[in-house]
Amino acid sequence: MVHLGALPGTPLYDEQRGLEGLVAQARADLVALQEAGVDAVMFGNENDRPYELEVGTASVAAMAYVIGRLRPDVRVPFGVDVLWDPCATVALAAATGAVFAREIFTGLYASDMGLWSRQAARALRDRRLYGREDLFLMFNVSAEFASPLDARSVVERARSAVFSSLADAVLVSGPMTGEPASLEVLARVKQALPDVPVLANTGVTHDNVAEVLRVADGCIVGTCLKKDGITWNPVDPQRAVAFMERVRRIREAIM
């Protein structure tokens, strides 16, 4: 993950550093991750706390500006996520040429931000309107900071997201950013969806990545690669290198 700094207009935005400061820090994180050998990177606005369910155009424009400035430095496939707005995420992906996008596309949740009522239908129609049918959509089916107002299990919600909402991949999360998803739930979701990529979305660390990759097809990693393992800190190049070295050993053992 390349967590962009707080964007203009959000409570934690650093006006002194400005947009150029955001570009500089994101570039440093991007370079560190690529030199460590990651498979892909995803740009997100995790620092825009408290989060919005409908993100303003100014934030989307700022993210597009930063990503556009970084495009010459990007050497791996990249994706985007505009928390917590699936339509803004698809729009940003279309504007920047992202290969994949992550968001909460389905479900009804009670959360710190109020009630989430997601509409995959609109987001996927936007994808079609933008001419980006190739955009790979990863559906988070167990939202952080929220509880589903749905009696169905995570497995049932995941199966439904694929069947009725055309999810390209399914993500399983822990209760908070940086906290792990249940390995048991991950395994059950993967067993139910053998032909669909299933990834761990939060809380993957140097210590548990081997267990995660035994049951999931992949993982999205942010917090454990940061300085001192703190989500809001810059990427620590040494932690990133150590993590990817461990992943390579795991892959060699599996193969």
Q: Where does each model-flagged region fall?
A:
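Hydrophobic faces of well-ordered beta-strands that scaffold small-molecule active sites
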Residues: 1-2, 41-43, 78-80, 101-103, ...
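Active-site mouth loops of central-metabolism enzymes
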Residues: 2-28, 78-85, 139-155, 200-206
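Conserved anion-binding
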Residues: 4-13, 88, 92-169
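Conserved, mostly hydrophobic/aromatic
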Residues: 33, 41, 101, 161, ...
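Glycine-rich, proline-tolerant flexible connector loops at the mouths of alpha/beta enzymes
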Residues: 37-62, 108-112, 167-180, 228-230
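Alpha-helix-loop-beta-strand connector modules within alpha/beta enzyme cores
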Residues: 52-80, 118-139, 181-205, 238-254
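Catalytic cores of alpha/beta
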Residues: 80, 85-98, 156-157, 189-194, ...
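Short loop-to-alpha-helix "cap/lid" segments that border enzyme active sites
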Residues: 151-170, 177-195, 207
